[in-house]
Amino acid sequence: MRVVTFAVLIMSLSAVSVAQDTRPVRQSAPRWPDGTINLGAPPGQTGMWDGGEPLTTIPNNYEKVGGRPRPGLVHLDQIPIQPWARALLDARHARFLADEPYTRCKPSPAARAFQTAYGIELLNLPGTGRIYLFQTGGAHSFRVIYMDGRSHPRDVQPTNFGHSIGWWDGDTLVIDTAGFNEGFWMDRDGLPHTSQLHTIERFTRTDFSSIRYELTVDDPGAYTSAFGGQMNLRWEAGTELFEYQCQQMNYANELMVGQFEKVDRSSFIIP
């Protein structure tokens, strides 16, 4: 009887072992020959990063968080926002975010770049002194991050993407950006900012399929102190950025082809 019991136990453990062996192996982050983390697809492969997560959660908005918020998600009440900026934020939500620049095909930096349905690509090539971040769409938006040790210019011309310099902190890419204009929203929920905005972004490819994105916002024109949050980017293997019709002031494709006479803003979906 003991022999039978022991045999059954061995078979059971073997079955568990086989089941465990068939589980997908977690791949480590790819690296270039010099040891630098590759933030994109390995040579000969394709893929892009998909975000979509909110950086903040705002009471009574279209992205309610059920249950316990994930780590890194910042509640609006925890953001040290100035009264005028909070009033502007409330006004944007009263208009159902209808004035958001990104939905009018304007480029957007910081967290907003990762809160779309279309993905982004990160390209870092050792020896070039540059890292590029590409966004999909007809606007052909991309950022250049200078990795050659330079500083920000004293009189930088304000732009949507600002002026970005970067460096490696171990396996984490750190990007310091200043010189923003006020023509964009830095996240999908409409957080205001001023030309004093200064951001620090940290990209950590924790494994082949994941990047932890951390953002620190410092804008004394709109907030009483610096604050930050984080989100996760997911790797979509075998995919590439694609073209779609997107021009400034193009409110709807239907208007261009004459099927409708007005824009329907009743949908909760924000591109």
Residue ranges with predicted function:
Residues 1-4:
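Positively charged n-region of N-terminal signal peptides that target proteins for export
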Residues 18-271:
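PEST-like low-complexity, intrinsically disordered acidic/proline/serine-rich tracts
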Residues 14-16:
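N-terminal signal peptide c-region/cleavage motif recognized by signal peptidases
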